[in-house]
C-alpha cells in the first residue's frame, strides 16, 4: 500500500472544481485506490486559513478520507537546508519554506507526493 501526501494546490483544485473529469480529481482517485491519502498541518493551515471559521475536513473535502499528520521533526532539517540552497542558487520565490516542508515530509515518511 502506497501512502500519498496531497499538496495544497491539488486540494484547492478539488474545492474549486470538483468535476470528476478534472486532472486533480482523477489523479486523487487513483492515489486513493493505491493507498492512504495524507495531508499535514502545513497543508491544513494553507487550506483552512482561508475560511472565517475552521471547517471540518470531511465536510470541506466532500467525504474524502484524508489522514492529517503532524509534520515530522526529522523533516525540519532537510526542508531548511533545501530552502537555503534554493535561495543561494538564486531562487526568486521567497515564500517557499512551506513547500520544502511538505516535500521533506513526503521524503522522510516514504510517501508519494501529489502536486501540480
Functional labels for PLM-detected ranges:
Residues 8, 41, 98-100:
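Conserved glycosyltransferase catalytic-site signature
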Residues 46-47, 65:
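Helix-loop "lid/cap" segments that line or gate small-molecule binding pockets
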Amino acid at each position: 500500500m502506497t501512502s500519498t501526501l496531497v499538496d495544497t494546490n491539488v486540494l484547492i483544485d478539488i474545492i474549486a472544481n470538483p468535476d470528476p473529469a478534472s486532472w486533480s480529481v482523477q489523479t486523487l482517485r487513483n492515489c486513493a485506490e493505491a493507498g492512504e491519502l495524507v495531508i499535514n498541518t502545513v497543508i491544513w493551515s494553507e487550506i483552512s486559513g482561508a475560511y472565517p471559521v475552521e471547517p471540518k475536513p470531511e465536510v470541506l473535502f466532500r467525504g474524502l478520507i484524508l489522514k492529517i499528520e503532524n509534520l515530522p521533526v526529522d523533516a525540519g532539517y532537510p526542508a531548511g537546508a533545501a530552502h537555503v540552497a534554493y535561495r543561494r542558487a538564486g531562487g526568486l520565490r521567497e515564500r517557499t519554506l512551506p513547500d520544502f516542508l511538505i516535500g521533506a515530509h513526503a521524503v522522510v515518511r516514504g510517501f508519494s507526493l501529489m502536486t501540480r
